Amino acid sequence: MKHVDIFTDGACSGNPGPGGWGAVLRYGETEKELSGGEADTTNNRMELLAAISALNALKSPCEVDLYTDSAYVKDGITKWIFGWKKKGWKTADNKPVKNVELWQALEAAQERHKVTLHWVKGHAGHPENERADELARKGMEPFKRR
């Protein structure tokens, strides 16, 4: 099984507002960069889309170390999702889970891979995370109102 490192980030101008996501995928010496955005979104949606898009870009099952500066993404997929599913995608206080379609897409995207999630402090000089942030801002650009 190939080993791939993935670094993701999301950005939003206003929250909600125009947003973007970025991802850097590294397999050995090979790197691939992905980015995209939406006109009206939130930072959490962009963080989720970065991870989903990166995992879906992998052509075969891989062992993945996924680095995110989003505690929301890390805690959601490693802790909260199990309870949400048990309760029919409801939170502890019985409210519908926000961004449920993205959580379901992230769960599906990681199913064929062996994913280990890592939280990194954002904007702390981590080169690949800084690059993912640049890509997220680039992905947001076309949607910003001038």
Swiss-Prot record:
Query: What does the record say about how the cofactor binds?
Result: Binds 1 Mg(2+) ion per subunit. May bind a second metal ion at a regulatory site, or after substrate binding.
Annotated GO molecular function terms are:
magnesium ion binding; nucleic acid binding; RNA-DNA hybrid ribonuclease activity
* Keyword Cytoplasm carried by entry: yes
Q: Which PROSITE patterns match?
A: RNASE_H_1
Tell me what reaction this enzyme catalyses: Endonucleolytic cleavage to 5'-phosphomonoester
Which segments carry the region annotation Disordered?
123-146
Q: Name one GO biological process term.
A: DNA replication, removal of RNA primer
Residue ranges under compositional bias (Basic and acidic residues)? 125-146
RNase H type-1 domain location? 1-141
Provide the cofactor list for this protein.
Mg(2+)
Q: Which cellular component terms (GO) are annotated to the entry?
A: cytoplasm
Tell me any Pfam family this protein matches: RNase_H
The UniProt annotation places Mg(2+) 1 binding at D9, E47, D69
Quote the EC number: 3.1.26.4
Residues that bind Mg(2+) 2:
D9, D133
Q: Which UniProt keywords apply?
A: Cytoplasm, Endonuclease, Hydrolase, Magnesium, Metal-binding, Nuclease
- What InterPro entries would the database entry show? RNase_H (IPR050092), RNaseH-like_sf (IPR012337), RNaseH_domain (IPR002156), RNaseH_sf (IPR036397), RNaseHI (IPR022892)
Please indicate if the UniProt record lists Transport as a keyword. no
Q: Where in the cell is it found?
A: Cytoplasm
The UniProt entry, under NCBIfam families, shows: PRK00203.1
Q: What does the function comment of this entry state? A: Endonuclease that specifically degrades the RNA of RNA-DNA hybrids.
Q: Describe the subunit structure.
A: Monomer.
Recorded hits in PANTHER family, A to Z, give:
RIBONUCLEASE H1
Q: Give the similarity note.
A: Belongs to the RNase H family.
HAMAP family this protein is in? RNase_H
User: What is the designated name of this protein?
Assistant: Ribonuclease H
What species is given as this protein's source? Agrobacterium fabrum (strain C58 / ATCC 33970) (Agrobacterium tumefaciens (strain C58))
